[in-house]
């Protein structure tokens, strides 16, 4: 019992550290000092550190996912493909309001990613934003806010909370255009939450998130953006 409480406390500290990192390193530093380089470097370094720590803290859940792949590989593939297609469809639908109302608006999160790609080396950028960043976000928004929190709250509340926070997390301004352009994050969050709840494999959302981010970075490389 004491050991379980200790683990829960450590994971709570992990979530708190993530919140502090995002609010101070990204938001406050960017708004107060108006220095995007320092803000992005803090974010990249923090994602690398928190990603490694998170993998260690949630190693039991990750091992469970790996074991699930070994035992039910076909089932995992079906869930992954189904989730990917569903996410693409829902994200496209969620993107319509932004395209209709603000067709020329570029999301501040995308601008930040492009800026980061130009400021740091490609290997560091891919490691932080393509691999460890998604892992960290999945541990926070899906592992903790859904898989763990559903023991205390109804699953539907956990899904709504996780998905809304996941969307807000990617907003860099409290404006209607910024809200609209991040609606696809809300739909993606819902899809990933459903996977956590019903697939019995917690690593699927991680793999999909990493795949989506690294694919986007590959496109940026091919287009000469980074």
Predicted segments with their positions:
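Transmembrane helix-loop-helix hairpins at the membrane interface
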Residues: 92, 118-226
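Short, Lys/Arg-rich, polar N-terminal cytosolic tail immediately upstream
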Residues: 1-7
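Juxtamembrane helix-loop-helix connectors linking adjacent transmembrane helices
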Residues: 34, 62-133, 151, 221, ...
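Cytoplasmic juxtamembrane interface segments
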Residues: 54-74, 145, 204
């Amino acid at each position: 019992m004491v050991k379980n409480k200790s683990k829960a406390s450590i994971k709570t500290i992990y979530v708190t550290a993530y919140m502090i990192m995002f609010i101070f390193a990204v938001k406050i530093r960017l708004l107060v000092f108006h220095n995007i380089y320092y803000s992005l470097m803090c974010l990249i370094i923090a994602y690398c550190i928190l990603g490694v720590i998170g993998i260690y803290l949630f190693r039991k859940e990750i091992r469970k996912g790996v074991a699930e792949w070994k035992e039910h590989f076909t089932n995992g593939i079906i869930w992954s493909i189904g989730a990917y297609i569903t996410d693409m469809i829902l994200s496209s639908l969620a993107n319509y309001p932004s395209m209709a109302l603000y067709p020329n608006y570029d999301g501040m999160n995308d601008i930040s990613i492009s800026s980061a790609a130009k400021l740091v080396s490609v290997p560091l950028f891919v490691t932080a934003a393509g691999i460890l960043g998604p892992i960290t976000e999945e541990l926070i928004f899906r592992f903790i806010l859904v898989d763990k929190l559903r023991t205390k709250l109804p699953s539907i509340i956990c899904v709504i909370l996780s998905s809304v926070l996941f969307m807000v997390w990617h907003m860099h301004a409290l404006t209607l255009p910024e809200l609209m352009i991040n609606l696809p994050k809300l739909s993606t969050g819902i899809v990933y939450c459903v996977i956590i709840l019903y697939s019995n494999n917690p690593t699927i959302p991680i793999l999909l998130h990493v795949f989506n981010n690294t694919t986007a970075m590959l496109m940026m490389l091919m287009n000469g953006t980074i």
